[in-house]
């Protein structure tokens, strides 16, 4: 009976831990159930066709904290919507994260974006599928797949983007003390056009600029959150010290 109770207790603890993680990530399954990728190097999880990172930034937070602040369900109508408006996008809509058979989780984003081009429409409808997967080593991969419905040759290609969020550790005790986020893009052509090189160059330039703006905004949000936590902890310590002082010397500190 003791062994059975111990096993049941272990199962309950595991369920609770999964529920805590689910609060941060939506209905995320156990990490162990997600498909593994061969190779220990995190870069192996970014296919070769994506090439080198266009943008890279380090953060004083874990990959989970980065996700929660910028990409979680709770961040959709705050950080994510703010970034959409700042980019000039309208008619923004976003579903919640749902389980995906291969990528872990996915959601659909729709919006109307301005077009920076001398010819064609001034704006276009965009449909974007986002995915994410968290690996056992805390490496987080967030993927975007976007098509633009109203631009010339819009049905010829899709823009495939990946955010690679790799945890950083201190030397010696190997304690996680931050993460590095790199941004990779691949223009996937479904049909041939003689304008492929022009389209690819334009996409890389625009997505790099957007990624830089996104990461700078993410850093501001995370820094503000960190400062708020530090301030709250400092106030709590001061209050506790004053309470101890008051009790010891019978001093009224109110």
Over which residues does each language-model region extend?
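Phosphoinositide-driven peripheral membrane association surfaces
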Residues: 1
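Hydrophobic ligand-binding cavity/cleft-lining segments
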Residues: 8-118, 254
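Beta-rich interaction modules in large eukaryotic scaffold/regulatory proteins
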Residues: 36, 176-178, 233-234
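Amphipathic alpha-helical interaction motifs in eukaryotic regulatory proteins
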Residues: 67, 71, 166, 208-219, ...
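Hydrophobic-cavity lipid-handling domains and compact docking modules
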Residues: 100-161, 167
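Beta-strand/loop substructures that line and gate deep hydrophobic ligand-binding cavities in soluble
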Residues: 136-202
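A conserved amphipathic terminal alpha-helix motif
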Residues: 186-230
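Terminal single-pass membrane anchor helices
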Residues: 227-254
């Amino acid at each position: 009976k003791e062994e059975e109770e111990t096993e049941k207790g272990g199962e309950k603890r595991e369920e609770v831990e999964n529920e805590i993680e689910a609060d941060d990530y939506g209905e995320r399954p156990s990490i162990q159930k997600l498909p593994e990728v061969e190779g220990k190097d995190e870069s192996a999880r970014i296919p070769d066709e994506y090439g080198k990172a266009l943008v890279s930034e380090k953060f004083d937070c874990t990959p989970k904290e980065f996700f929660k602040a910028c990409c979680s369900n709770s961040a959709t109508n705050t950080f994510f919507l703010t970034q959409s408006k700042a980019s000039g996008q309208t008619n923004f809509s976003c579903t919640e994260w749902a389980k995906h058979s291969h990528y872990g989780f996915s959601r659909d984003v729709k919006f109307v974006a301005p077009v920076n081009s001398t010819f064609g429409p001034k704006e276009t409808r965009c449909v974007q599928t986002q995915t994410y997967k968290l690996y056992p080593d805390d490496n987080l991969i967030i993927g975007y797949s976007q098509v633009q419905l109203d631009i010339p040759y819009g049905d010829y290609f899709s823009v495939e983007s990946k955010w690679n969020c790799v945890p950083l550790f201190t030397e010696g005790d190997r304690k996680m003390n931050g993460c590095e986020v790199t941004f990779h893009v691949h223009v996937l052509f479904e049909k041939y056009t003689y304008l492929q090189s022009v389209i690819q160059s334009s996409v890389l330039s625009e997505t790099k600029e957007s990624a830089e703006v996104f990461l700078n905004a993410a850093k501001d949000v995370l820094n503000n959150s960190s400062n708020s936590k530090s301030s709250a902890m400092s106030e709590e310590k001061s209050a506790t010290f004053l309470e101890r002082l008051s009790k010891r010397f019978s001093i009224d500190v109110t």
